[in-house]
Amino acid sequence: MSNRNDADQLRRDWADSPRWAGITRPYSAEEVVRLRGSVQVEHTLARLGAEKFWRLLHTEKVVAALGAMTGNQAVEEIQAGLKAIYCSGWQVAGDGNSAGEMYPDQSLYPVDSVPKMVERINNALLRTDQIHHM
């Protein structure tokens, strides 16, 4: 696709999608297309999770979630019927950080702690999905 087509498509998405309602941007669609380059990196799990959560927020009265520190906890929560998983900053600070230390709940733990926790949770959910689709 050309940069012009990409910018036109992005502009239409911003105008038509309820996801972007009320957002004011100090930049143009052309600037976004120019800065992001020609290769679109796809983060499938993040996109699917964000789309599902957005849909839940707009269709469910309440979206119940419990904190999960491990992949197994996340799998059990989903198997129990929860539709969302919460990654608690307090849990990361207290016991789930990559330094293996205990920190106060002030985001003082190593910066890679939450991404590593999410990676473990995603890996467990992916493996469970693979097992159930064999």
Where are these regions (language model features)?
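Conserved, mostly hydrophobic/aromatic
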Residues: 14, 77
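Mature N-terminal, pre-catalytic/accessory segment of carbohydrate-active enzymes
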Residues: 15-16, 26
